[in-house]
Amino acid sequence: MVVVGKSEVRNVSMSRPKKKSLIAILSTCVLFFLVFIIGAKFQYVSVFSKFLDDRGDNESLQLLNDIEFTRLGLTPREPVIIKDVKTGKERKLHGRFLHITDIHPDPYYVEGSSIDAVCHTGKPSKKKDVAPKFGKAMSGCDSPVILMEETLRWIKENLRDKIDFVIWTGDNIRHDNDRKHPRTEAQIFDMNNIVADKMTELFSAGNEEDPRDFDVSVIPSLGNNDVFPHNMFALGPTLQTREYYRIWKNFVPQQQQRTFDRSASFLTEVIPGKLAVLSINTLYLFKANPLVDNCNSKKEPGYQLLLWFGYVLEELRSRGMKVWLSGHVPPIAKNFDQSCYDKFTLWTHEYRDIIIGGLYGHMNIDHFIPTDGKKARKSLLKAMEQSTRVQQGEDSNEEDEETELNRILDHAMAAKEVFLMGAKPSNKEAYMNTVRDTYYRKVWNKLERVDEKNVENEKKKKEKKDKKKKKPITRKELIERYSIVNIGGSVIPTFNPSFRIWEYNITDIVNDSNFAVSEYKPWDEFFESLNKIMEDSLLEDEMDSSNIEVGINREKMGEKKNKKKKKNDKTMPIEMPDKYELGPAYVPQLFTPTRFVQFYADLEKINQELHNSFVESKDIFRYEIEYTSDEKPYSMDSLTVGSYLDLAGRLYENKPAWEKYVEWSFASSGYKDD
């Protein structure tokens, strides 16, 4: 009977009605091809999509859908429908999200003004000194407002209906680089309010009764230029933390208002009971913040932030959830106070069963840094031993003075580097070469020493020959010690404007009772308990661990006899218990990132086309695919930590691959050090 059916289908396919259908489809394809060629340049594809939608031609719509995804470099896939058992609300999951950062809109930007006058005023001295409509890469000017508006319009027309959430990592105001127009706190708040309103308008569900109802969740974080003075941010509650809660009231869950007032950090469930994003106020760890000395004293903002961080991670683990970390300043040694860097790195390492990765901005260079959790723990233990010796008078005061001097110099250097980020880029190739020669080289050396086939035999030989020598480790052990810090390219034309779409695994998501989270303490109860803990930590010298409702076991360090036992540091995690398995960052599973697509706007080409054309600017401005993670030199099958370490090794040993990687790091702007 099936065979008969097939025969009948083949016969019917030659009948007149089917021929008409075939001709219609072919005609549609030809028409679409012509529109697609034009649309690739002028972005008319969405108009044609509406035309087909009105016709109701399902076959043509499917074809269009596939071509549309191909045009955008995205993996075509059917969305998954999920339902929140508590609210009863259904939504589509696409398995993609957007990371966008460092927009830096400048209302003083004037088209045709002098680049030498930061594009604010003045008559250009030469053709190259003219400020173009959409901004100029490597000029040192901030983003014209139209660049921000056209970027968001392009996202709306091309990506909004294909993503699940947006990670937006700060710096939504111009740099303070014009003495004629010094920034004020009011201006900073006003522009952040404007950008937040635009994000709300773009991604909200349009529900007037519930302004927190979003089709696409938005998770903002605070940039170092979003505060006044820039870089300086005190532990809350302050005017600034309260003002940002007002500005972000639609993004920050209401039950977290008190914790946000204190830390300007919060948690968002982007898939209820399954997946969360943490917005981390990295300014409390930032060495350029003059109010940050270290992360060891309870009164330090960094200590309080890490305390919050630890309790939230443990709660997410207890609920069986996975989490992305996000923030403005990347958590690398260059940016953070040493104790803050070591502790933050250690937390990400010891919660590798739930942390998927970290997304950051600030540096305007598209690249990644592997951070070593095992090394961070060693560094912390060494610092604690040294601190104990100082307290016992075993070290001289001169060493203490030298440490303080180094700290002051670190603050000064960091502040200078941050100031230069608002100027024309310089020495960025030198920085990237440092990344290659330190981080990537070390990874390559370690990978070279790992030989899975012979490692067990080598271990036995080493044990017999000399027990004091280091034992070789397996590839799995090597990979486990690392986490990946992803640093995004920026919208501001330090180079070319850019952003990234991440794709992740949603294959195993099903619409069932697993989405119910009623067996866990409601989030408002958790955060109420956490608020009490945070307040007590500032008032008491030592908190009685028996009073902690949100349990985190703390590491204990033994002391010699007749010496005072060292108090536990609650901002240091214990080692990850063996009962927990590696999470999505290490082993392909639900929520593992699978690939990404990097988009950029070629400003030189766009401005030139605008100059030579009578077409409206909105029909010329566009983002293009710069590269994807599965093409050379990336050639990544997935975005696990192991894949990133392999890439780091290839980039170190393969010069052509490295050169291409650096070209993309600067958003194909052609940047070179002077």
Swiss-Prot record:
It catalyses: [phosphate](n+1) + n H2O = (n+1) phosphate + n H(+); [phosphate](n) + H2O = [phosphate](n-1) + phosphate + H(+); dATP + H2O = dADP + phosphate + H(+). Residues 1-21 are cytoplasmic. It is found in: Vacuole membrane; Cytoplasm. Processing by proteases in the vacuole is required for activation. Ubiquitinated. Ubiquitination mediates sorting into internal vesicles in late endosomes. TUL1 and RSP5 are required for ubiquitination. Other cytoplasmic Lys residues than Lys-6 may also be ubiquitinated. Its EC number is 3.6.1.10, 3.6.1.-, 3.6.1.11. Changing K6 to R/G: Causes accumulation in vacuoles and abolishes sorting into internal vesicles in late endosomes. Its cofactor is Mn(2+); Mg(2+); Co(2+); Zn(2+). Pfam families: Metallophos (PF00149). GO terms for molecular function: endopolyphosphatase activity; exopolyphosphatase activity; metal ion binding. Optimum pH is about 7.5. Residues 43-674 are vacuolar. The chain crosses the membrane at residues 22-42. One of its GO terms (biological process) is polyphosphate catabolic process. One of its GO terms (cellular component) is nucleus. There is a cross-link at K6 (Glycyl lysine isopeptide (Lys-Gly) (interchain with G-Cter in ubiquitin)). Divalent metal cations. Exopolyphosphatase activity is predominant in the presence of Co(2+), while endopolyphosphatase activity is predominant in the presence of Mg(2+). Co(2+) is more effective than Mn(2+) for dATP phosphohydrolase activity. The yeast vacuole plays an important role in Zn(2+) storing and sequestering. Therefore, the changes in Zn(2+) concentration may regulate the enzyme's activity. SUPFAM superfamilies: Metallo-dependent phosphatases (SSF56300). The keyword Transmembrane helix applies. Inactivation of PPN1 leads to the inhibition of expression of both exopolyphosphatase PPX1 and high-molecular-mass exopolyphosphatase not encoded by PPX1. Present with 319 molecules/cell in log phase SD medium. The transmembrane domain contains polar residues that mediate the recognition by TUL1. PANTHER family: ENDOPOLYPHOSPHATASE, SPHINGOMYELIN PHOSPHODIESTERASE. Belongs to the endopolyphosphatase PPN1 family. This is Endopolyphosphatase. It comes from Saccharomyces cerevisiae (strain ATCC 204508 / S288c). The gene is PPN1.
